Amino acid sequence: MHLLIAAAGSGRRMGADRNKLLLPLAGRPVIAWTIEAALRSERIEWIGIVGQEVDREAILAVLDEPSKPVHWIQGGSTRQESVLCGLAGLPEQARHVLIHDGARCLAEPKLFDRCAAVVEDGTALIAATPVSDTIKRVGSDGVIRDTPDRSELWAAQTPQGFAVDQLRRGHAEAVAQGWTVTDDASLYERLGWPVQVLDAGPANIKVTTPFDLTVAEAVLALRSAG
């Protein structure tokens, strides 16, 4: 299985002046935890890190004689463009790909393995977790419009996995139609292509705010304590 790690995050919501993936988490940069989990996965055989040139040296510095091929791929100005760049940077023999947010640094090796097994069996999927809160749809005036059925709501996460050829076709259609999507599953939805959810649990958070960093520190401490 080939893996693309989206690593072009900013530090704006962190109040930081650099890529949030380079902020310290339990003594190491956030991105180091993400890469380590991918390297420990039994099914991941090739890793592409998609990011901006300004972060290249710092991100690659976290690698210490990696056990698998790890390649740097120059990203675009948006996540959608960066995924396109990542797809272009895949080896010719790549048939399936997982795409993972570098900021989801609590993903464990077994999650990558579970996702890879489903994708290699021919099913597009996303890691996700059922929504536990009651969700309200609210208008621009701040007034509640309605309450979606919580039993049908899942919070999308990563990894997200697809057949490479089909994902490339989807992105080509998005470019032709001028579509903007926030993840690849949304692209599949527009095209009417099925995507399965795989329950990854609530710990697979995306580190975006200082509070998220605190939560991630606590989770890592619990895992370390065994």
Swiss-Prot record:
Pathway: Isoprenoid biosynthesis; isopentenyl diphosphate biosynthesis via DXP pathway; isopentenyl diphosphate from 1-deoxy-D-xylulose 5-phosphate: step 2/6. It comes from the Bacteria. It is an enzyme of class 2 (transferase). InterPro entries: IspD, IspD/TarI, IspD/TarI_cytidylyltransf_bact, ISPD_synthase_CS, Nucleotide-diphossugar_trans. Keywords: Isoprene biosynthesis, Nucleotidyltransferase, Transferase. It catalyses: 2-C-methyl-D-erythritol 4-phosphate + CTP + H(+) = 4-CDP-2-C-methyl-D-erythritol + diphosphate. The record marks 13, 20 as: Transition state stabilizer. The record marks 150, 206 as: Positions MEP for the nucleophilic attack. GO terms for molecular function: 2-C-methyl-D-erythritol 4-phosphate cytidylyltransferase activity. PROSITE patterns: ISPD. Pfam families: IspD. One of its GO terms (biological process) is isopentenyl diphosphate biosynthetic process, methylerythritol 4-phosphate pathway. The keyword S-adenosyl-L-methionine does not apply. Belongs to the IspD/TarI cytidylyltransferase family. IspD subfamily. NCBIfam families: ispD. Catalyzes the formation of 4-diphosphocytidyl-2-C-methyl-D-erythritol from CTP and 2-C-methyl-D-erythritol 4-phosphate (MEP). This is 2-C-methyl-D-erythritol 4-phosphate cytidylyltransferase. The lineage of its organism: Bacteria, Bacillati, Cyanobacteriota, Cyanophyceae, Synechococcales. The gene is ispD.
